[in-house]
Swiss-Prot record:
The gene is frr. Its main location: cytoplasm. GO terms for biological process: cytoplasmic translational termination. This is Ribosome-recycling factor. GO terms for molecular function: ribosomal large subunit binding. Belongs to the RRF family. Responsible for the release of ribosomes from messenger RNA at the termination of protein biosynthesis. May increase the efficiency of translation by recycling ribosomes from one round of translation to another. It is found in: Cytoplasm. The lineage of its organism: Bacteria, Pseudomonadati, Pseudomonadota, Gammaproteobacteria, Legionellales. Disulfide bonds: none annotated. Coiled coil: none annotated.
Length: 185
C-alpha cells in the first residue's frame, strides 16, 4: 500500500515536470524553436487544424523557423495563421516555403516573459506540494484504518518529502534555465 502511494506520487510529480517543460517550450525566447508553432491552428478546408499536421516545421538556423507546407495551396493560410497568432512573428513567403524570422526580444518583453515563466514555475511547485499533501492524507487514512503503523506512516511521509524536494529542485532548475535563455541577447 505504501509503495503504491509513493509510486503514484512520483508518477504524478513526473507528469507535472513534463507539463512544465511543455509550457516552457511555448514561451518564446530570442532563439528559434520548432515547438513554438505547435499550438498555431490553420484553417484547413474549413476546419481548424494544428500547423504540424499540414506542414513540416524545422529550424534553418538559430533565428529562423522554416515552415514547408505539404500542399502548395496552404501557403497563404499558414502565413495568415502565423500572423494572427499571439507570438508577434512576421512570416515571409519564399516560393513554397515560409520563413519565420525570430525578432530580438525587447528588454520590456523579456521582463514580461520572465514574470510568466516564474508564474508557471510557481504553479509547478504548488502542484507538486498538492501531490505531497494528497499522499500524506492517504497515509493518515491508512493509519486511521489501522492498516499501517504510525512509524510506517512517518517513514513513508519522509520518503514522499524527499521526492517532493527532488522534484521542486527540478522545477527550480527548469525555471533557472528558461530565465537564462530569456536574458541572453
Amino acid at each position: 500500500m505504501i509503495n503504491e502511494i509513493k509510486q503514484d506520487s512520483e508518477k504524478r510529480m513526473k507528469k507535472t515536470i513534463e507539463a512544465l517543460h511543455s509550457d516552457m517550450s511555448k514561451i518564446r525566447t530570442g532563439r528559434a524553436n520548432a515547438s513554438l508553432l505547435d499550438h498555431v491552428m490553420v484553417d484547413y478546408y474549413g476546419s481548424p487544424t494544428p500547423l504540424s499536421q499540414v506542414a513540416n516545421i524545422t529550424t534553418s538556423d538559430s533565428r529562423t523557423i522554416l515552415v514547408t507546407p505539404w500542399e502548395k495551396s496552404m501557403v497563404a493560410a499558414i502565413e495568415k495563421a502565423i500572423l494572427n497568432s499571439d507570438l508577434g512573428l512576421n512570416p515571409a513567403t519564399a516560393g513554397t516555403a515560409i520563413r519565420v524570422p525570430m525578432p530580438p526580444l525587447t528588454e520590456e518583453r523579456r521582463k514580461e516573459l520572465i514574470k510568466v515563466v516564474r508564474h508557471e514555475g510557481e504553479q509547478g511547485r504548488v502542484s507538486i506540494r498538492n501531490i505531497r499533501r494528497d499522499a500524506n492524507n492517504q497515509l493518515k487514512e491508512l493509519v486511521k484504518e489501522k492498516a499501517i503503523s504510525e512509524d510506517d506512516e512517518r517513514r513513508a511521509a519522509e520518503a514522499i518529502q524527499k521526492l517532493t524536494d527532488r522534484y521542486i529542485s527540478e522545477v527550480d532548475a527548469v525555471l533557472a534555465e528558461k530565465e537564462k535563455d530569456l536574458m541572453e541577447i
